[in-house]
Curated annotation (Swiss-Prot):
The lineage of its organism: Eukaryota, Fungi, Dikarya, Ascomycota, Pezizomycotina. Pathway: Carbohydrate degradation; glycolysis; D-glyceraldehyde 3-phosphate and glycerone phosphate from D-glucose: step 4/4. Its EC number is 4.1.2.13. Gene3D superfamilies: Aldolase class I. Zn(2+) 2 binds at D145, E175. GO terms for biological process: gluconeogenesis; glycolytic process. It comes from Paracoccidioides lutzii (strain ATCC MYA-826 / Pb01). Induction: Preferentially expressed in yeast cells, the host parasitic phase. This is Fructose-bisphosphate aldolase 1. The active site is at D110.
């Protein structure tokens, strides 16, 4: 049985119970869905092509900075207005184009720290407006990241937002335990290493609190994760901690499931296949990738420019003749497409690494 056999909506953006079914199926079949950060229609297309070609479900997500870029750098963002508008624009674009690729897509928003809560509020306003018209939220899910705050305030505030999302059957991802490194303007490179590891007791408290509100939630637990890419050996991941979290929650709740918690792997760029495989075996259903894909996109553009540099120095004139036009080389559709190709190839690798290929 494949993913499409269990979903009520087979292609395009899925919501509510379909998201829950997808994550349940992922745990049962021991695979995780790549969560790809997108910042433009071009990166959306690259990711969707990879999922189609690998016959796989995919998660597309926009960060606060990525959403602002989607809106345009000329739009003011002092009150998160560009990030709200850009996220909504990305959502409508993805909803419009995703069915053409014949795959199920989870439409998600990435890290929302305390200072960015107005961004989340604005998107939830849009979700509720969309829900009134279509009986489903605009976004499949959101991510609230209050891991830098006290555990108590983190859980209390996350619960408040889950209560708002629950009537729409909207998924909410939360983070406990800081992910190191730097991403999208949030810098945790100097945090104490002990802060990178979540305790089982905290996972249970979160699970108990949130499950009383809604089943539509997942937890990004810290097990040494770091955003960005670093030299081998500089990042010490301990995926085995995730197994302890599952066992502790199972014991405390008396659950019949060996993996009662839907877990998320943040800071996936640069991790080894073995680390991915082990984490997924402990109930990770979503793995975030961003930095690797940024570099993959660049590599296609870079290689094209270096290879064709003699055709890119002027609009007219190249090694074939001083009157020869170069439009077919400098047309943005040409070199942007090269970036899409290399990014798509890297996303395809992720489907293989996470055992997601041919799961539809």
């Amino acid at each position: 049985m494949g993913v499409k056999d269990i979903l009520s909506r087979k292609t395009g953006v899925i919501v509510g119970d379909d998201v829950l079914r997808l994550f349940q199926h992922a745990q049962e079949k021991v695979f995780a869905i790549p969560a790809i950060n997108v910042t433009s229609s071009s990166t959306v297309v690259a990711a969707l092509e990879a999922a189609r070609d690998k016959n796989s479900p995919i998660i597309l997500q926009v960060s606060q900075g990525g959403a602002a870029f989607f809106a345009g750098k000329g739009v003011p963002n002092g009150k998160q207005e560009a990030s709200v508008a850009g996220a909504i624009a990305a959502a409508h674009y993805i909803r419009s184009i995703a069915p053409s690729y014949g795959i199920p897509v989870v439409l998600h928003t990435d890290h929302c720290a305390k200072k960015l809560l107005p961004w989340l509020d604005g998107m939830l306003d849009a979700d509720e407006c969309y829900f009134k018209l279509h009986n489903e939220p605009l976004f499949s899910s959101h991510m609230i990241d209050l891991s830098e705050e006290s555990v108590e305030w983190n859980i209390e505030t996350t619960a408040k937002y889950l209560k708002r999302a629950a009537p729409m059957k909207q998924w909410l991802e939360m983070e406990i335990g800081i992910t190191g490194g730097e991403e999208d303007g949030v810098n945790n490179e100097s945090v104490d290493n002990n802060s990178l590891y979540t305790q089982p007791e905290d996972i249970y408290t979160i699970y108990k609190t949130l499950s009383a509100i809604s089943p539509y939630f997942s937890i990004a637990a810290g097990f040494g994760n770091v955003h960005g890419v670093y030299k081998p050996g500089n990042v010490r991941l301990h995926p085995e901690l995730l197994s302890k979290h599952q066992a502790y929650v199972k014991e405390k709740t008396g659950s019949s499931k060996n993996k009662p918690v839907y877990l998320v792997f943040h800071g996936g760029s640069g991790s080894t296949k073995a680390e991915f495989k082990e984490a997924i075996s402990y109930g990770v259903v979503k793995v975030n990738l961003d930095t690797d894909l940024q570099y993959a996109y660049l590599s296609g553009v870079r290689d094209f420019v270096l290879k064709k540099k003699d055709y890119l120095m002027s609009a007219v004139g190249n090694p074939e003749g001083e009157d020869k036009p170069n439009k077919k080389y400098f047309d943005p559709r040409v070199w942007i497409r090269e970036g899409e190709k290399t990014m798509s190839a890297r996303v395809q690798e992720a489907f293989d690494d996470f055992n997601t290929s041919n799961q539809l």
